[in-house]
């Protein structure tokens, strides 16, 4: 990698230069295609030859249409005569039918029927006149059917007349005139195409030389465009490579810093775990037993305390156990405490009576033998696995058990401490192995990502070059 930082190429300027070259290429390509077209017309190809064939095909179609018109005229004349005779016959039938109908239209018939019906409904007519009007109304209704036949006949006449007009229009020579005009127009275009082809034949050598010159100029422009695109791609590839390498360096630096931090954390955690495991086993139990012996004023040689205090950091990890004093909730202010004489009898299960002197002496003896221990002291006895004494007579047994527990703890202390240290070392080794495998997997994934980025970059560059 070069020492200086590559500069990213200006994409806007590059596109502007490409557009300028593309415009020149399009102009050169247009001139080249024109010369190629002229040579193709001379050699029997190109647009002029195709146009010549199209014009000839149109002339053939016009000739066929004119021949068909000439052959079909006689048939049209026969059809016109037949339709004209049919029209005259229908008109005569319509005229004869109208003479049989006394009314000009159906509207006039309806008006007359309404007048007759109004006269009948008025009730002022004589019976003879009324019968006459009714017969006339019936006759009018029968006449109404004749109007239906008249309308149908009139529709048929209109249809025949329209068909006759169409046939007469076809007999006119306007279509033939249009075809003739079209024939002359196409013939003129065909003559013009032939003149152009004749001119191309005369200048064939000149056209070939001009075409070769245009081809050379076009190839030169294409080479300029490829060189410009290649230079841009090279600069862009160098810039991307530099950026990728810088990003990889930053990622590697971050990874090393993170790895160092993780190593330091693991070292401190492993050191703490080993220090905790190196604390002599049963230290808290032995301290608890010694504190309990001190409660009963038994002299104790605290070798465990001295061993703990000689360590570098063990004394910071292990805190001395203290006996929690018994606490009593305070009585709210203003509370009146009242003792009833029946309470003793209730809880003792005896009848309410005046206690005898002998019972009083026994109670005093029991109170003097009772041993009051705090709740914290009782919890310490439970912690070391020794029953707590609740009378003075049980103190000696509890002291012996405490001494026995201290001896047992000290006897097992070295072996249990070694086991704890060995177990802590194994746990540290497992954690280190797990971290190393995880770190290797992370590095492999990072290498795969960088490799894929390089592949994508190379592929994009190749696509750009292929497009250019």
UniProtKB/Swiss-Prot annotation:
InterPro entries: Bfr1. GO terms for biological process: intracellular mRNA localization; mRNA metabolic process. This is Uncharacterized protein C458.02c. It is found in: Cytoplasm. One of its GO terms (cellular component) is nuclear outer membrane-endoplasmic reticulum membrane network. Keywords: Coiled coil, Cytoplasm, Phosphoprotein. The modification Phosphoserine is found at residue 342. Signal peptide: none annotated. Residues 324-369 are annotated as: Disordered. One of its GO terms (molecular function) is mRNA binding. Residues 10-94, 147-279, 399-445 form a coiled coil. Its main location: cytoplasm. The keyword Metal-binding does not apply.
């Amino acid at each position: 990698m070069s020492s200086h930082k590559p500069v990213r190429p200006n994409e806007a300027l590059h596109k502007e230069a490409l557009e300028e070259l593309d415009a020149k290429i399009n102009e050169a390509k247009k001139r080249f295609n024109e010369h190629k077209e002229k040579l193709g017309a001379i050699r029997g190809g190109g647009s002029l030859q195709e146009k010549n064939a199209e014009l000839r095909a149109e002339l053939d179609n016009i000739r066929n249409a004119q021949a068909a018109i000439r052959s079909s005229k006689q048939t049209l004349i026969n059809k016109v005569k037949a339709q004209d005779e049919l029209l005259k016959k229908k008109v005569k039938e319509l005229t004869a039918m109208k003479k049989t109908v006394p009314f000009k239209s159906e509207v006039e018939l309806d008006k007359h029927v309404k007048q007759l019906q109004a006269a009948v409904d008025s009730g002022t007519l004589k019976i003879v006149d009324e019968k006459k009007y009714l017969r006339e109304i019936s006759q009018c209704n029968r006449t109404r059917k004749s109007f239906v036949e008249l309308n149908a006949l009139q529709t048929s006449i209109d249809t025949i007349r329209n068909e006759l007009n169409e046939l007469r229009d076809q007999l006119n020579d306007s279509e033939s005139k249009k075809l003739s005009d079209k024939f002359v127009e196409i013939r003129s275009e065909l003559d013009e195409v032939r003149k152009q082809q004749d001119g191309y034949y005369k200048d064939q050598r000149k056209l070939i030389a001009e075409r070769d010159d245009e081809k050379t100029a076009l190839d030169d422009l294409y080479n300029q465009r490829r060189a410009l695109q290649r230079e841009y791609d090279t600069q862009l590839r160098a810039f991307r490579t530099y950026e990728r390498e810088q990003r990889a360096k930053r990622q590697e630096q971050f990874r090393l810093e993170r790895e160092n931090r993780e190593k330091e954390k693991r070292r401190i955690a492993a050191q703490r775990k080993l220090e905790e495991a190196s604390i002599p086993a049963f230290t808290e139990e032995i301290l608890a037993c010694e504190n309990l012996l001190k409660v009963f004023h038994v002299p104790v040689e605290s070798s465990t305390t001295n061993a703990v205090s000689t360590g570098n950091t063990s004394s910071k990890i292990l805190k001395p156990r203290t006996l929690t004093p018994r606490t009593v909730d305070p009585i709210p202010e203003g509370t009146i405490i009242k003792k009833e004489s029946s309470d003793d009898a209730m809880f003792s299960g005896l009848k309410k009576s005046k206690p005898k002197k002998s019972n009083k002496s026994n109670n005093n003896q029991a109170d003097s033998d009772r041993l009051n221990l705090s709740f914290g002291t009782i919890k310490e006895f439970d912690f070391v696995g020794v029953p707590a004494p609740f009378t003075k007579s049980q103190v000696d047994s509890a002291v012996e058990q405490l001494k026995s527990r201290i001896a047992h703890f000290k006897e097992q202390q070295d072996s249990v401490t070694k086991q704890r240290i060995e177990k802590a070392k194994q746990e540290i080794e497992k954690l280190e192995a797990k971290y190393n495998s995880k770190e290797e997997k992370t590095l492999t994934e990072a290498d795969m990502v960088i490799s894929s980025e390089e592949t994508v970059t190379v592929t994009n560059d190749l696509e750009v070059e292929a497009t250019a």
